[in-house]
Amino acid sequence: MAQVLTQFDTIAAISTPIGEGGISIVRLSGEDAVAIANKLFKGADLTQVPSHTIHYGHIVDPKTKDVVDETMVSVLRAPKTFTREDMVEINCHGGMIVTNDILQLLLANGARMADPGEFTKRAFMNGRIDLTQAESVMDIVRAKTDKSRQVAMTQLAGGLLDKIRTMRQELLDTMAHEEVNIDYPEYDMDDLTSQEMKKKAEEVSKQIDQLLKTAQEGKIIRNGLATAIVGRPNVGKSSLLNYLTQDDKAIVTDIAGTTRDTLEEYVSVKGVPLKLIDTAGIHHTEDKVEKIGVERSKKAIAEADLVLLLLDASQDLTDEDKNLLNLTANKKRIIILNKQDLGTKISQEMIREITDNPIIVTSILKQENMAALENAIEQLFFSGIENSQNQILVTNQRQAGLLAKAKQSLEDVVNGIDDAMPLDLVQIDLKNAWDTLGEITGESAPDELITQLFSQFCLGK
């Protein structure tokens, strides 16, 4: 864990969204947090109250003596706080003016405006959390479904941290054993030590493999299942988007080519996080703007985790339909036969001869059989991840990339031993793997990485 650092100044920020609301919270952290808040607070003497208590009073401008707001103030003393520093949280009435006035008074009386993510960064620097837990804090804030929140909570509880630390300890024990052999060569334990190193490298590599297998699942749960809504013009793509989002996010008309670009929307369908992409109709066109939309649609299909392919069941299968069936043949997809209320010229049996993908017959405008579509999405998504609530998942590209890098170093260890390389050289690769795993938790992460990571957080967090 990172070194405990205590020589920080005192920071302040608004921790709740700016705007009208019932309550806003202005947060302080640092050695002088209580003293600064006490300059403004008229009620109890905050410097004398017990830790983890809340007090009623008023925030008063020390210079003008004007009462700014009626508040409840929480005093939280180190080390049992989020940042492991003294903290104060001022609960005031929601509203842009009053909240900002309180913040400005805190800044005028000795606090500094917090950088984005600085509260969480201090929690990391003071050993309260590691980098995987810090990332999970933002995952909780940004969670779009219960599933993504549950996975983030598992990370915050230290699931991935414990796994990484166990692997690092195993590698450290192996390196320590090898150091004895290097320091005392008279015992001639090279063969024994090399086999031990190889075995341990292979064991840890397998553990990393198991984590890497969860990376795609973790990405989907964290970011949403990238779902492309695909079909030729005027088959009901935008109507499907509007049904799933329960909002008119796309223009629905009878004019072919109305959607000229890709539209994105996040929704939860029966607990499945979907990042919906309503694509432009893929068809031949001479319109330059439409051509751009068509190319973007093809790119969206290539990058999609799931394709919802719409066909107009009331019309014969067209060449454009056949092209889309071929274009999406290798994707996980659901075939939707829309407009069945207008007649049926494309049957399930006809499509079944082409593919074994799930087929849903519906009228989206009349919302007929839409529950079957939602059930099909749920079944496809949860078929292999029913236990992900308590499962340790790799949830972002940073973690996955470092795991892959560590695995490569371990493979270099195995190859080096097989090629009879000197053990002191092989151990360099073993230490590289150990260091790389430490970057995941922050135990060996460079300062610039830590700064960059926390800069992505919101103010007040």
Swiss-Prot record:
One protein family per Pfam: MMR_HSR1
Keyword tRNA processing: yes
Residues reported to bind K(+): N234, T253, I255, T258
GO cellular component terms, semicolon-separated: cytosol
Record's keyword terms, sorted: Cytoplasm, GTP-binding, Hydrolase, Magnesium, Metal-binding, Nucleotide-binding, Potassium, tRNA processing
GO biological process: tRNA methylation; tRNA wobble uridine modification
Main subcellular location: cytoplasm
Cofactor: K(+)
Localization in the cell: Cytoplasm
SUPFAM superfamilies: P-loop containing nucleoside triphosphate hydrolases
Enzyme Commission number(s): 3.6.-.-
One GO MF term attached to the UniProt entry: GTP binding
Manner of cofactor binding, per the entry note: Binds 1 potassium ion per subunit.
Disulfide bond annotation, renumbered to this chain: none
PANTHER family: TRNA MODIFICATION GTPASE GTPBP3 (PTHR42714), TRNA MODIFICATION GTPASE GTPBP3, MITOCHONDRIAL (PTHR42714:SF2)
Subunit architecture: Homodimer. Heterotetramer of two MnmE and two MnmG subunits.
UniProt family annotation: Belongs to the TRAFAC class TrmE-Era-EngA-EngB-Septin-like GTPase superfamily. TrmE GTPase family.
UniProt cross-references to NCBIfam families, sorted A to Z: mnmE_trmE_thdF (TIGR00450), PRK05291.1-3 (NF003661), small_GTP (TIGR00231)
Name listed for the protein in its UniProt record: tRNA modification GTPase MnmE
Organism field: Lactobacillus johnsonii (strain CNCM I-12250 / La1 / NCC 533)
